[in-house]
Amino acid sequence: MNLSRRRVSPIKPGETIDYKNIDLLSQFITEQGKILPRRVNGISAKQQRAITKAIKQARFLALLPFLNQDI
């Protein structure tokens, strides 16, 4: 019997996806700085596109690093 559970979205209903919200965006990137795929995040396709766009914008404005140099 396949009991699949609905995942709870890590993005709260009233929370906006914005490039300035670094705490939210850092949940969706790996330690190396790569953007996590949608199947790992458990978010909708629309939210994934918005997260990706916000992460890229934050990287461009130097709010997030392109690569993690701590390795």
Swiss-Prot record:
Pfam entry (one): Ribosomal_S18
Disulfides per UniProt: none
One Gene Ontology cellular component: chloroplast
PROSITE patterns per record: RIBOSOMAL_S18
Swiss-Prot/TrEMBL GO biological process terms: translation
Coiled-coil positions: none
Keyword RNA-binding set for record: yes
Keyword Glycosyltransferase attributed: no
Single annotated GO MF: small ribosomal subunit rRNA binding
Entry keywords, A to Z: Chloroplast, Plastid, Ribonucleoprotein, Ribosomal protein, RNA-binding, rRNA-binding
Compartmental location: Plastid, Chloroplast
Complex formation: Part of the 30S ribosomal subunit.
Family label: Belongs to the bacterial ribosomal protein bS18 family.
Protein name (Swiss-Prot/TrEMBL): Small ribosomal subunit protein bS18c
Source organism: Chlorokybus atmophyticus (Soil alga)
